[in-house]
Curated annotation (Swiss-Prot):
It comes from Turritis glabra (Tower mustard). This is Maturase K. GO terms for cellular component: chloroplast. GO terms for molecular function: RNA binding. The keyword Plastid applies.
């Protein structure tokens, strides 16, 4: 990290909070398009999650862009001239895209250095496993079984660009950088309006940074409120003076009544709360009463509306009781299941039965939503009946088969943690029969005649890797029994979800 700071000459810049001069350094562009910062902080930074941006780099283009940045009047061009004006063979839109990517990289630097310093002296073992989507499910299976309620929160987005600028002002004190940031945002709106009839213009790295910085600011305030309100859960976080007075009373209360009223102290302990954020949602699991869950619900509403100036309605926060309601989480339907367990005990000549109930988190496959996705992409109809994929009939037989096999294995790989595999087998059946119908349609034949000509070897291609591994690990009798039907496997190599059709 020290070597990296010296290379960037960033110590003096960071002390003065001046980031704008870095826009005129050529090696910063090398860093942006060579993934240097991403390789250095691969296991540390939470802001470098997406590297799917333009990797093209040319020193000549960079020098031209820096010259244009010195000549500010030539950089600002009306929206109607974005497509016509060009500078040495490149449109102005190309340079705006470069500036937006560069801005995301430059502003990531102080966040990455600050986050890296917080991990100094700490050993993170197997941190790559924590990057997997499946890594959260074993944690929830261990924790949610002891909780009662879950808050399912839809994180709101600010509808005005100035809210994003104001949020970033708490982290970046450089006025010039904030002006460049505001310039990129408003120019993006001009691009969006100008190209609204064409393919939309996206900059994943730039907008990923905006989203992460926005959520990071919200979470920092939320965790502060969580710590400050743990002993005073019924008092609003806005009444600070009453809270300070109440803390003094708590200290006196603990000293006087600690020996006489030990049961009352349970009300003053911090509640067990677990917070998980995924995609555009977050969940808050706790073992509180319905009254306290409603208080947490309006905590979120007041936080977004009063501090972030974002209109946030209470119906976007759902209170789910785990014993009755299903929690839709990362493509799974999770709920608590009671597993009765009868234990026979014998003492001397007397024997008796003990009924125990074990609470377990049950994760199931949302078959209706998956069938809806398959029907949307023309693999089946809305009832789940397989149909031929007409748009793929122009491809070769091997290409069609490989596409279906890849989709089938990806779905089977992701939903291997389901407690019941019946719905997974139904999805496999839909994809297999859709593949056969597509090939039969291409060869202008019926499904029966096509299978009779090729034999059953075609369907063996859909045998997933985990099926092959389990058949080697477990005995044949166990593999053929229903016990393997309940085997749950969580993989720690799933870092993102692929598109159903377009992923290659």
């Amino acid at each position: 990290m020290d070597k990296f700071q010296g290379y960037l000459e960033f110590d003096g810049v960071r002390q003065q909070s001046f980031l704008y001069p870095l826009f005129f350094r050529e090696y910063i562009y090398v860093l942006a398009y060579d993934h240097g910062l991403n390789r250095l902080n691969r296991n540390r930074s939470i802001f470098l999650e997406n590297t799917d941006y333009d990797k093209k780099y040319s020193s000549l283009i960079v020098k031209r862009l820096i010259l244009r940045m010195y000549e500010q009047n030539r950089l600002i061009i009306p929206t109607k001239d974005l497509n016509q004006n060009s500078f040495l063979g490149h449109t102005s839109l190309f340079y705006y895209q470069m500036i937006s990517v560069l801005f995301a990289v430059i502003v990531e630097i102080p966040f990455s250095l600050r986050l890296g310093s917080s991990f100094q002296g700490k050993q993170l073992k197997k941190s790559y496993n924590l990057q997997s989507i499946h890594s959260i499910f074993p944690f929830l299976e261990d924790k949610l079984a002891h909780f009662n309620y879950v808050l399912d929160v839809l994180i709101p987005y600010p509808i005005h660009l100035e809210i994003l600028v104001q949020t970033l002002r708490y982290r970046v004190k450089d006025a010039s950088s904030l002006h460049x940031f505001r310039f990129c945002l408003y120019e993006y709106c001009n691009w969006k309006n100008f190209y609204k009839k064409k393919k939309p213009i996206l900059n994943p790295r730039f907008f990923l940074f905006l989203y992460n910085s926005h959520v990071c600011e919200y979470e920092s305030i939320f965790f502060f409120l969580r710590k400050r309100s743990s002993h005073l859960r019924s008092t609003s976080y806005e009444v600070l003076f009453e809270r300070i007075l109440f803390y003094g009373k708590i200290q006196h209360f603990l000293k006087v009544f600690v020996n006489n009223f030990p049961a009352i102290l349970g009300l003053l302990k911090d509640p067990f709360i677990h917070y998980v954020r995924y995609h555009g949602r977050c969940i808050l699991a706790t073992k509180d009463t319905p009254l306290l869950m409603n208080k947490w619900k309006y905590y979120f509403v007041n936080l977004w509306q009063c501090y972030f100036s974002v209109w946030f309605q209470s119906h976007k926060v759902n209170i789910n009781k785990l014993s009755k309601d299903n929690l839709e989480f990362l493509g799974y339907l999770s709920s608590l299941r009671l597993n009765p367990l009868v234990v026979r005990s014998q003492m001397l000549e007397n024997s008796f039965l003990i009924d125990n109930v074990r609470i377990k988190l049950d994760s199931k496959i949302p078959i209706s939503s998956i069938i809806g996705s398959l029907a949307k992409d023309k693999f089946c109809n809305v009832l789940g009946h397989p149909i031929s994929k007409a748009t793929w009939t122009d491809s070769s037989d091997s290409d069609i088969l490989n596409r279906f096999v890849r989709i089938c294995r990806n779905i089977s790989h992701y939903y291997s943690g389901s407690s019941k595999k019946k719905n997974l087998y139904r999805i496999k059946y839909i994809l297999r029969l859709c593949c056969v119908k597509t090939l039969a349609r291409k060869h202008k034949s019926t499904v029966r005649a096509f299978l009779k000509r090729l034999g059953s070897g075609l369907l063996e291609e859909f045998l997933t890797g985990e099926d092959q591994v389990l058949s080697l690990i477990f005995p044949r009798s166990y593999y053929a029994s229903k016990r393997l039907y309940r085997v749950r496997i969580w993989y720690l190599d799933i870092l993102y979800l692929n598109d159903l059709v377009n992923h290659e």
